[in-house]
Protein backbone atom coordinates (compact mmCIF):
# COMPACT_ATOMS: atom_id res chain seq x y z
CA UNK A 1 0.00 0.00 0.00
CA UNK A 2 1.34 3.46 -0.89
CA UNK A 3 0.27 6.97 0.09
CA UNK A 4 1.34 9.95 -2.01
CA UNK A 5 1.44 13.55 -0.81
CA UNK A 6 2.25 16.17 -3.48
CA UNK A 7 2.53 19.95 -3.37
CA UNK A 8 1.44 21.32 -6.77
CA UNK A 9 2.32 24.87 -7.81
CA UNK A 10 -0.43 27.49 -7.41
CA UNK A 11 -2.17 28.21 -10.69
CA UNK A 12 -4.94 30.56 -11.69
CA UNK A 13 -8.26 29.01 -10.79
CA UNK A 14 -9.85 29.56 -14.20
CA UNK A 15 -6.88 28.02 -15.97
CA UNK A 16 -6.86 25.07 -13.65
CA UNK A 17 -10.53 24.44 -14.28
CA UNK A 18 -9.78 24.07 -17.98
CA UNK A 19 -7.39 21.20 -17.38
CA UNK A 20 -8.97 17.93 -18.24
CA UNK A 21 -8.74 14.88 -16.05
CA UNK A 22 -6.19 13.11 -18.24
CA UNK A 23 -3.77 16.02 -18.12
CA UNK A 24 -3.98 16.21 -14.35
CA UNK A 25 -3.41 12.47 -14.16
CA UNK A 26 -0.28 12.75 -16.32
CA UNK A 27 1.11 15.51 -14.08
CA UNK A 28 0.55 13.38 -11.01
CA UNK A 29 2.13 10.42 -12.71
CA UNK A 30 5.19 12.49 -13.63
CA UNK A 31 5.59 13.76 -10.09
CA UNK A 32 5.15 10.34 -8.52
CA UNK A 33 7.88 8.76 -10.63
CA UNK A 34 10.40 11.58 -10.72
CA UNK A 35 10.22 13.09 -7.26
CA UNK A 36 10.14 10.10 -4.96
CA UNK A 37 12.10 7.01 -4.26
CA UNK A 38 10.84 4.24 -6.50
CA UNK A 39 10.10 1.81 -3.71
CA UNK A 40 7.25 -0.53 -4.53
CA UNK A 41 6.04 -3.52 -2.52
CA UNK A 42 5.86 -6.91 -4.19
CA UNK A 43 2.11 -7.45 -4.34
CA UNK A 44 2.61 -11.12 -5.25
CA UNK A 45 4.36 -11.78 -1.94
CA UNK A 46 2.44 -12.92 1.13
CA UNK A 47 0.71 -9.99 2.86
CA UNK A 48 2.90 -10.33 5.91
CA UNK A 49 5.97 -9.64 3.70
CA UNK A 50 4.54 -6.51 2.05
CA UNK A 51 5.69 -3.30 3.78
CA UNK A 52 3.53 -0.16 3.81
CA UNK A 53 5.21 2.70 1.92
CA UNK A 54 4.41 6.40 2.39
CA UNK A 55 5.80 9.44 0.54
CA UNK A 56 6.06 13.07 1.57
CA UNK A 57 7.60 16.23 0.08
CA UNK A 58 8.56 18.85 2.62
CA UNK A 59 7.49 22.40 1.81
CA UNK A 60 10.38 24.70 1.04
CA UNK A 61 9.75 28.28 2.15
CA UNK A 62 12.12 29.80 -0.40
CA UNK A 63 10.15 28.33 -3.30
CA UNK A 64 7.56 30.54 -4.97
CA UNK A 65 5.92 27.32 -6.06
CA UNK A 66 6.54 23.74 -5.01
CA UNK A 67 7.47 21.86 -8.19
CA UNK A 68 10.19 19.74 -9.73
CA UNK A 69 12.46 22.81 -10.02
CA UNK A 70 12.05 24.00 -6.45
CA UNK A 71 11.04 21.76 -3.61
CA UNK A 72 11.99 20.60 -0.16
CA UNK A 73 13.33 17.29 1.03
CA UNK A 74 11.67 14.15 -0.28
CA UNK A 75 10.93 11.56 2.38
CA UNK A 76 9.84 7.96 1.97
CA UNK A 77 8.78 6.13 5.12
CA UNK A 78 8.62 2.35 5.07
CA UNK A 79 6.48 0.73 7.73
CA UNK A 80 8.45 -2.48 7.88
CA UNK A 81 6.65 -5.79 8.30
CA UNK A 82 6.03 -7.49 11.62
CA UNK A 83 9.23 -9.16 12.83
CA UNK A 84 9.18 -12.87 13.62
CA UNK A 85 10.21 -14.38 16.95
CA UNK A 86 13.86 -14.00 15.93
CA UNK A 87 13.41 -10.26 15.39
CA UNK A 88 13.63 -10.54 11.59
CA UNK A 89 11.40 -8.24 9.52
CA UNK A 90 11.28 -9.67 5.98
CA UNK A 91 10.16 -7.09 3.39
CA UNK A 92 9.72 -7.88 -0.31
CA UNK A 93 9.74 -5.32 -3.11
CA UNK A 94 9.12 -5.17 -6.82
CA UNK A 95 11.46 -2.17 -6.89
CA UNK A 96 13.78 -0.55 -4.37
CA UNK A 97 15.43 2.64 -5.68
CA UNK A 98 16.23 5.94 -4.00
CA UNK A 99 16.40 8.39 -6.89
CA UNK A 100 18.67 11.35 -7.39
CA UNK A 101 16.74 14.59 -7.02
CA UNK A 102 17.10 18.30 -6.40
CA UNK A 103 16.12 17.95 -2.76
CA UNK A 104 17.69 15.92 0.03
CA UNK A 105 16.29 12.45 -0.44
CA UNK A 106 15.74 10.16 2.52
CA UNK A 107 14.28 6.75 3.16
CA UNK A 108 13.19 5.90 6.70
CA UNK A 109 12.75 2.35 7.91
CA UNK A 110 10.06 2.84 10.55
CA UNK A 111 11.04 0.77 13.58
CA UNK A 112 9.03 2.89 16.03
CA UNK A 113 6.54 1.17 18.28
CA UNK A 114 5.05 4.46 19.48
CA UNK A 115 4.71 7.93 17.98
CA UNK A 116 7.65 10.29 18.25
CA UNK A 117 8.16 13.91 17.10
CA UNK A 118 7.76 13.98 13.33
CA UNK A 119 6.89 10.31 12.98
CA UNK A 120 3.94 8.01 13.60
CA UNK A 121 4.57 4.64 15.20
CA UNK A 122 4.58 1.61 12.92
CA UNK A 123 1.29 -0.29 13.38
CA UNK A 124 2.99 -3.48 12.15
CA UNK A 125 5.15 -3.59 15.28
CA UNK A 126 2.83 -5.32 17.71
CA UNK A 127 4.97 -6.43 20.62
CA UNK A 128 8.57 -5.72 19.62
CA UNK A 129 10.76 -3.76 17.26
CA UNK A 130 12.82 -5.46 14.57
CA UNK A 131 16.43 -6.42 15.14
CA UNK A 132 17.11 -7.15 11.46
CA UNK A 133 15.36 -5.44 8.53
CA UNK A 134 15.68 -7.55 5.39
CA UNK A 135 14.71 -5.78 2.16
CA UNK A 136 14.51 -8.28 -0.71
CA UNK A 137 13.91 -7.26 -4.34
CA UNK A 138 12.16 -10.03 -6.25
CA UNK A 139 12.00 -8.47 -9.74
CA UNK A 140 14.72 -7.98 -12.36
CA UNK A 141 15.05 -4.25 -11.58
CA UNK A 142 18.37 -3.22 -10.09
CA UNK A 143 18.46 -0.94 -7.05
CA UNK A 144 19.87 2.58 -7.34
CA UNK A 145 20.67 4.31 -4.06
CA UNK A 146 21.37 8.05 -4.28
CA UNK A 147 20.53 9.30 -0.81
CA UNK A 148 20.18 8.69 2.90
CA UNK A 149 18.66 5.54 4.38
CA UNK A 150 18.00 5.62 8.11
CA UNK A 151 16.35 3.46 10.74
CA UNK A 152 14.03 5.47 12.97
CA UNK A 153 13.27 4.13 16.40
CA UNK A 154 15.06 1.08 17.70
CA UNK A 155 18.42 0.53 16.01
CA UNK A 156 18.41 -2.46 13.63
CA UNK A 157 20.62 -4.16 11.07
CA UNK A 158 19.70 -3.30 7.47
CA UNK A 159 20.00 -5.66 4.50
CA UNK A 160 19.28 -4.86 0.85
CA UNK A 161 19.28 -7.98 -1.32
CA UNK A 162 18.84 -7.63 -5.07
CA UNK A 163 20.18 -10.31 -7.46
CA UNK A 164 19.80 -7.87 -10.37
CA UNK A 165 22.42 -5.54 -8.94
CA UNK A 166 22.90 -2.56 -6.62
CA UNK A 167 24.22 0.86 -7.66
CA UNK A 168 25.21 3.24 -4.87
CA UNK A 169 26.13 6.85 -5.59
CA UNK A 170 26.19 8.89 -2.42
CA UNK A 171 24.19 6.43 -0.34
CA UNK A 172 24.41 6.84 3.43
CA UNK A 173 23.19 4.67 6.29
CA UNK A 174 22.48 5.75 9.86
CA UNK A 175 21.11 4.34 13.13
CA UNK A 176 22.20 0.87 12.06
CA UNK A 177 25.29 -0.99 13.23
CA UNK A 178 25.32 -3.52 10.41
CA UNK A 179 24.57 -2.88 6.74
CA UNK A 180 24.60 -5.61 4.10
CA UNK A 181 24.32 -4.98 0.37
CA UNK A 182 24.12 -8.21 -1.59
CA UNK A 183 23.13 -9.59 -4.96
CA UNK A 184 22.49 -12.94 -3.32
CA UNK A 185 19.19 -14.63 -2.58
CA UNK A 186 18.57 -14.78 1.20
CA UNK A 187 18.56 -18.24 2.76
CA UNK A 188 16.94 -19.16 6.05
CA UNK A 189 17.50 -21.56 8.90
CA UNK A 190 14.80 -22.21 11.52
CA UNK A 191 13.16 -18.86 10.84
CA UNK A 192 16.42 -16.99 11.11
CA UNK A 193 18.51 -15.50 8.33
CA UNK A 194 21.07 -18.12 7.37
CA UNK A 195 22.99 -16.34 4.62
CA UNK A 196 22.94 -15.60 0.91
CA UNK A 197 23.19 -17.65 -2.27
CA UNK A 198 25.20 -15.54 -4.73
CA UNK A 199 25.32 -16.56 -8.40
CA UNK A 200 24.94 -13.23 -10.22
CA UNK A 201 24.79 -9.48 -9.91
CA UNK A 202 27.13 -6.56 -9.57
CA UNK A 203 27.54 -3.95 -6.84
CA UNK A 204 28.82 -0.59 -8.07
CA UNK A 205 29.92 2.18 -5.72
CA UNK A 206 30.06 5.29 -7.90
CA UNK A 207 31.88 8.62 -7.53
CA UNK A 208 29.86 9.99 -4.57
CA UNK A 209 30.65 6.86 -2.58
CA UNK A 210 29.06 5.01 0.33
CA UNK A 211 29.10 6.24 3.92
CA UNK A 212 28.31 4.18 6.98
CA UNK A 213 30.28 5.42 9.94
CA UNK A 214 28.09 6.67 12.74
CA UNK A 215 30.92 5.30 14.87
CA UNK A 216 33.87 2.93 14.48
CA UNK A 217 31.95 -0.08 15.82
CA UNK A 218 29.83 -0.65 12.71
CA UNK A 219 29.90 -3.33 10.03
CA UNK A 220 29.46 -3.20 6.27
CA UNK A 221 29.10 -6.34 4.14
CA UNK A 222 29.24 -6.32 0.33
CA UNK A 223 28.38 -9.75 -1.12
CA UNK A 224 28.07 -10.02 -4.91
CA UNK A 225 29.33 -11.78 -8.01
CA UNK A 226 31.45 -8.72 -8.79
CA UNK A 227 32.24 -5.39 -7.14
CA UNK A 228 33.34 -2.08 -8.67
CA UNK A 229 34.43 0.75 -6.38
CA UNK A 230 34.72 4.08 -8.14
CA UNK A 231 34.19 6.28 -5.06
CA UNK A 232 34.99 6.27 -1.36
CA UNK A 233 33.60 3.54 0.89
CA UNK A 234 33.72 4.48 4.58
CA UNK A 235 32.62 2.27 7.47
CA UNK A 236 33.85 0.58 10.63
CA UNK A 237 34.68 -2.96 9.48
CA UNK A 238 34.23 -3.78 5.79
CA UNK A 239 33.84 -7.34 4.49
CA UNK A 240 33.55 -8.01 0.77
CA UNK A 241 33.00 -11.48 -0.66
CA UNK A 242 32.78 -11.77 -4.43
CA UNK A 243 32.19 -14.54 -6.91
CA UNK A 244 29.67 -17.36 -6.85
CA UNK A 245 29.35 -18.24 -3.18
CA UNK A 246 27.01 -19.86 -0.71
CA UNK A 247 27.53 -17.45 2.17
CA UNK A 248 26.57 -18.63 5.61
CA UNK A 249 26.29 -16.22 8.53
CA UNK A 250 25.75 -17.20 12.15
CA UNK A 251 24.93 -15.04 13.89
CA UNK A 252 24.73 -11.66 12.19
CA UNK A 253 27.91 -9.69 12.98
CA UNK A 254 29.48 -13.08 13.73
CA UNK A 255 31.48 -15.53 11.64
CA UNK A 256 30.99 -15.84 7.89
CA UNK A 257 31.35 -19.13 6.03
CA UNK A 258 32.11 -18.94 2.31
CA UNK A 259 31.48 -21.96 0.11
CA UNK A 260 32.29 -21.56 -3.60
CA UNK A 261 29.53 -22.59 -6.01
CA UNK A 262 30.48 -24.41 -9.20
CA UNK A 263 33.79 -25.22 -10.83
CA UNK A 264 36.46 -22.60 -10.21
CA UNK A 265 38.08 -23.55 -13.53
CA UNK A 266 34.95 -22.51 -15.44
CA UNK A 267 36.03 -20.55 -18.52
CA UNK A 268 32.98 -18.28 -18.20
CA UNK A 269 34.00 -16.85 -14.84
CA UNK A 270 34.75 -13.13 -14.55
CA UNK A 271 38.48 -12.29 -14.63
CA UNK A 272 38.25 -9.33 -12.25
CA UNK A 273 35.54 -9.51 -9.61
CA UNK A 274 36.82 -6.74 -7.32
CA UNK A 275 37.91 -3.54 -9.04
CA UNK A 276 38.94 -0.51 -6.98
CA UNK A 277 39.55 2.15 -9.61
CA UNK A 278 41.98 5.07 -9.49
CA UNK A 279 39.21 7.28 -8.09
CA UNK A 280 38.01 4.63 -5.65
CA UNK A 281 38.97 3.94 -2.08
CA UNK A 282 38.08 1.94 1.01
CA UNK A 283 38.54 3.46 4.46
CA UNK A 284 37.70 1.50 7.58
CA UNK A 285 38.95 0.03 10.83
CA UNK A 286 39.32 -3.43 9.29
CA UNK A 287 39.02 -4.36 5.62
CA UNK A 288 38.55 -7.93 4.39
CA UNK A 289 38.40 -8.56 0.64
CA UNK A 290 37.76 -12.18 -0.40
CA UNK A 291 37.52 -13.20 -4.05
CA UNK A 292 36.91 -16.91 -4.51
CA UNK A 293 36.79 -17.21 -8.29
CA UNK A 294 38.30 -14.06 -9.76
CA UNK A 295 40.94 -11.42 -9.29
CA UNK A 296 41.32 -8.28 -7.18
CA UNK A 297 42.49 -5.11 -8.91
CA UNK A 298 43.32 -2.00 -6.88
CA UNK A 299 44.40 1.26 -8.48
CA UNK A 300 42.96 3.35 -5.67
CA UNK A 301 43.44 3.37 -1.90
CA UNK A 302 42.74 0.63 0.63
CA UNK A 303 43.33 2.12 4.07
CA UNK A 304 42.54 0.33 7.33
CA UNK A 305 43.24 1.49 10.86
CA UNK A 306 43.81 -2.06 12.18
CA UNK A 307 44.00 -4.69 9.41
CA UNK A 308 43.75 -5.12 5.63
CA UNK A 309 43.30 -8.72 4.47
CA UNK A 310 43.11 -9.55 0.74
CA UNK A 311 42.54 -13.11 -0.53
CA UNK A 312 42.04 -14.21 -4.14
CA UNK A 313 41.93 -17.57 -5.87
CA UNK A 314 42.99 -15.93 -9.14
CA UNK A 315 45.29 -12.90 -8.79
CA UNK A 316 45.83 -9.65 -6.91
CA UNK A 317 47.05 -6.51 -8.68
CA UNK A 318 47.97 -3.41 -6.70
CA UNK A 319 49.66 -1.76 -9.66
CA UNK A 320 50.01 1.96 -8.88
CA UNK A 321 47.59 1.45 -6.00
CA UNK A 322 48.03 1.92 -2.27
CA UNK A 323 47.39 -0.45 0.63
CA UNK A 324 47.98 1.09 4.05
CA UNK A 325 47.35 -0.58 7.42
CA UNK A 326 49.27 -1.58 10.57
CA UNK A 327 48.66 -5.24 9.66
CA UNK A 328 48.51 -6.39 6.04
CA UNK A 329 47.93 -9.88 4.67
CA UNK A 330 47.85 -10.50 0.91
CA UNK A 331 47.38 -14.06 -0.34
CA UNK A 332 46.58 -15.55 -3.73
CA UNK A 333 46.72 -18.90 -5.49
CA UNK A 334 47.79 -16.88 -8.54
CA UNK A 335 50.13 -13.96 -9.07
CA UNK A 336 50.46 -10.88 -6.87
CA UNK A 337 51.61 -7.69 -8.60
CA UNK A 338 52.63 -4.49 -6.84
CA UNK A 339 54.14 -2.85 -9.92
CA UNK A 340 54.55 0.81 -9.07
CA UNK A 341 52.31 0.30 -6.06
CA UNK A 342 52.73 0.96 -2.34
CA UNK A 343 52.11 -1.47 0.48
CA UNK A 344 52.73 0.28 3.76
CA UNK A 345 52.42 -0.72 7.41
CA UNK A 346 52.85 1.87 10.14
CA UNK A 347 52.87 0.21 13.53
CA UNK A 348 55.44 2.31 15.38
CA UNK A 349 53.91 3.48 18.66
CA UNK A 350 50.86 1.21 18.35
CA UNK A 351 50.15 -1.55 20.86
CA UNK A 352 49.81 -5.04 19.41
CA UNK A 353 50.21 -8.62 20.55
CA UNK A 354 53.85 -9.51 21.17
CA UNK A 355 53.36 -12.73 19.20
CA UNK A 356 51.96 -10.78 16.25
CA UNK A 357 55.35 -9.80 14.94
CA UNK A 358 54.60 -9.78 11.22
CA UNK A 359 53.15 -6.52 9.99
CA UNK A 360 53.15 -7.55 6.32
CA UNK A 361 52.64 -11.07 4.95
CA UNK A 362 52.48 -11.66 1.19
CA UNK A 363 52.23 -15.03 -0.53
CA UNK A 364 51.36 -15.96 -4.12
CA UNK A 365 52.46 -18.07 -7.07
CA UNK A 366 54.61 -15.19 -8.30
CA UNK A 367 55.14 -11.90 -6.47
CA UNK A 368 56.18 -8.91 -8.58
CA UNK A 369 57.27 -5.72 -6.78
CA UNK A 370 58.97 -4.10 -9.78
CA UNK A 371 59.27 -0.34 -9.10
CA UNK A 372 56.99 -0.93 -6.12
CA UNK A 373 57.38 -0.31 -2.41
CA UNK A 374 56.77 -2.65 0.53
CA UNK A 375 57.49 -0.75 3.73
CA UNK A 376 56.98 -1.18 7.47
CA UNK A 377 58.19 0.99 10.35
CA UNK A 378 57.85 -1.66 13.06
CA UNK A 379 57.46 -5.40 12.66
CA UNK A 380 58.51 -8.15 10.29
CA UNK A 381 57.94 -8.52 6.55
CA UNK A 382 57.39 -11.93 4.96
CA UNK A 383 57.25 -12.30 1.17
CA UNK A 384 56.83 -15.81 -0.20
CA UNK A 385 56.09 -17.32 -3.59
CA UNK A 386 55.72 -20.76 -5.13
CA UNK A 387 57.83 -19.74 -8.14
CA UNK A 388 59.38 -16.28 -8.12
CA UNK A 389 59.78 -13.00 -6.27
CA UNK A 390 60.74 -10.03 -8.46
CA UNK A 391 61.95 -6.83 -6.80
CA UNK A 392 63.52 -5.24 -9.87
CA UNK A 393 63.86 -1.48 -9.18
CA UNK A 394 61.67 -2.05 -6.13
CA UNK A 395 62.05 -1.43 -2.41
CA UNK A 396 61.38 -3.84 0.46
CA UNK A 397 62.18 -1.98 3.64
CA UNK A 398 61.71 -2.49 7.38
CA UNK A 399 63.00 0.27 9.62
CA UNK A 400 62.14 0.15 13.31
CA UNK A 401 63.38 2.18 16.25
CA UNK A 402 62.02 -0.48 18.60
CA UNK A 403 60.51 -3.91 18.02
CA UNK A 404 61.10 -6.44 15.26
CA UNK A 405 62.17 -5.50 11.75
CA UNK A 406 63.15 -8.77 10.07
CA UNK A 407 62.65 -9.41 6.35
CA UNK A 408 62.06 -12.96 5.12
CA UNK A 409 61.85 -13.92 1.45
CA UNK A 410 61.39 -17.41 0.03
CA UNK A 411 60.83 -18.60 -3.56
CA UNK A 412 62.48 -20.69 -6.28
CA UNK A 413 63.74 -17.49 -7.89
CA UNK A 414 64.43 -14.17 -6.21
CA UNK A 415 65.38 -11.25 -8.46
CA UNK A 416 66.60 -8.07 -6.75
CA UNK A 417 68.30 -6.48 -9.76
CA UNK A 418 68.54 -2.71 -9.13
CA UNK A 419 66.35 -3.30 -6.10
CA UNK A 420 66.65 -2.60 -2.38
CA UNK A 421 66.08 -5.00 0.51
CA UNK A 422 66.94 -2.95 3.58
CA UNK A 423 66.33 -3.30 7.32
CA UNK A 424 67.79 -2.41 10.67
CA UNK A 425 67.63 -6.07 11.72
CA UNK A 426 67.77 -9.52 10.10
CA UNK A 427 67.36 -10.52 6.46
CA UNK A 428 66.76 -14.12 5.40
CA UNK A 429 66.47 -15.07 1.73
CA UNK A 430 65.87 -18.67 0.66
CA UNK A 431 65.96 -19.30 -3.11
CA UNK A 432 67.26 -21.69 -5.71
CA UNK A 433 68.36 -18.81 -7.95
CA UNK A 434 69.21 -15.45 -6.38
CA UNK A 435 69.99 -12.38 -8.50
CA UNK A 436 71.23 -9.11 -6.98
CA UNK A 437 72.84 -7.36 -9.94
CA UNK A 438 73.34 -3.68 -9.01
CA UNK A 439 70.99 -4.35 -6.12
CA UNK A 440 71.37 -3.85 -2.38
CA UNK A 441 70.66 -6.35 0.38
CA UNK A 442 71.54 -4.52 3.58
CA UNK A 443 71.04 -5.16 7.29
CA UNK A 444 72.26 -2.10 9.16
CA UNK A 445 72.79 -3.70 12.57
CA UNK A 446 72.30 -7.46 12.33
CA UNK A 447 72.54 -10.58 10.14
CA UNK A 448 72.02 -11.42 6.47
CA UNK A 449 71.37 -15.13 5.88
CA UNK A 450 71.33 -16.27 2.24
CA UNK A 451 70.40 -19.75 1.06
CA UNK A 452 70.76 -20.35 -2.69
CA UNK A 453 71.96 -22.70 -5.40
CA UNK A 454 73.14 -19.99 -7.78
CA UNK A 455 74.00 -16.36 -6.99
CA UNK A 456 74.39 -13.52 -9.48
CA UNK A 457 75.47 -10.23 -7.89
CA UNK A 458 77.34 -8.12 -10.43
CA UNK A 459 77.96 -4.67 -8.92
CA UNK A 460 75.57 -5.64 -6.14
CA UNK A 461 75.97 -4.96 -2.42
CA UNK A 462 75.30 -7.50 0.32
CA UNK A 463 76.00 -6.16 3.80
CA UNK A 464 75.28 -7.29 7.34
CA UNK A 465 75.92 -5.07 10.35
CA UNK A 466 77.08 -8.15 12.28
CA UNK A 467 77.73 -10.69 9.52
CA UNK A 468 76.64 -12.21 6.22
CA UNK A 469 76.05 -15.96 6.08
CA UNK A 470 75.80 -17.75 2.75
CA UNK A 471 74.71 -21.34 2.31
CA UNK A 472 75.07 -22.91 -1.14
CA UNK A 473 72.40 -25.55 -1.67
CA UNK A 474 73.41 -28.90 -3.17
Regions found by a protein language model. Name each.
Residues 22-34:
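Bacterial N-terminal signal peptides
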Residues 3-7, 38-42, 473-474:
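N-terminal intrinsically disordered, low-complexity tails enriched in polar/charged
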Residues 85-88, 103-107, 113-115, 139-143, ...:
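Extracellular beta-strand scaffolds
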Residues 1-18:
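N-terminal secretory signal peptides that target proteins for export/translocation
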Residues 36-303:
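Solvent-exposed adhesion/ligand-recognition segments of exported proteins
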Amino acid sequence: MSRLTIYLPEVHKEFFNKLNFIYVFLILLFFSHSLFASIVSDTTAPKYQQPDIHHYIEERKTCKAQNVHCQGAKFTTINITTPNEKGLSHNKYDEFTLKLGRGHNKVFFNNLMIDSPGFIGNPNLVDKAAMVILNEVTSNKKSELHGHLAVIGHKADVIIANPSGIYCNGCQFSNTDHVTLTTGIPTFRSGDLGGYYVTQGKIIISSNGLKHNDNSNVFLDLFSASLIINGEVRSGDVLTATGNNDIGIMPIKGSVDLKPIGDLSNSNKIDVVVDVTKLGGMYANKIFIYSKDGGIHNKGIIEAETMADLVSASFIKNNFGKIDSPKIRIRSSGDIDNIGGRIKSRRQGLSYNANDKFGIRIFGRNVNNSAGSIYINSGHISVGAVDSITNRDGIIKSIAVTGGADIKMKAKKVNNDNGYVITTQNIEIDATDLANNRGKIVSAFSHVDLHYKTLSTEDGIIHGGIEVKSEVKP
